[in-house]
Amino acid sequence: MITFLALSLLAHAVDRDVAEHTRLSEEIEQLAQRQLWLGVEKKYVELEKLGVELSFDDLMHGAYAARALGNMQGAYHRLKQASKIKTTKDVIETMYAIDENYGLVELITVPPRGDVLSVAEIPFDPDQRTAVDAAVTYVKEKGVYKGLLPKGKYVFAGQPFTVEPGIGLKIEVSPHMKKTTGEIVKVATTPTWGSGADDGEKPPEPTPQKQ
């Protein structure tokens, strides 16, 4: 009897999650059609919290929302998940474009404090501009940033650096000893595949289309 009750409760919980998944997916679709990306992102986060298996469309809408909000690393991660379901030409080309034009950076102030991130030349591409703007705002508020930035020259907390695709860059700036020798700056670089491949694997090839 106890086992039957437990199974019944489990089935009810699963049905409830499935219904909630359907509801959120429909809302995401409607918001995406209107290009209300902040709303899409909020609903996508709710969807992730359900712990259900996301569909290809869920992941693609999530990727577009992350890109529109300047979170290129989030966009890449969601595209990569989508590619495991369906490796379309659009998905793979977008992943390669990110790998070829962005670099992975981690910027840290010790202790954390709001600081300044500036770029030498504002990117022409709107997605790249949005990514830069999002990073600048986050650094101003938090003094730290970890994610993808467009390739180019930047200055973080007075420390110049260059973002290059295929190179992971970590910069740690501390104000200690500022009165005597200036700020302590630690810079470390690590090779990556492209930039967005967080596990070192290159994007998959598109699935051949049937003739």
Where would I find each of the regions flagged by the language model?
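Acidic, Pro/Ser/Gly/Ala-rich intrinsically disordered segments
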Residues: 1-211
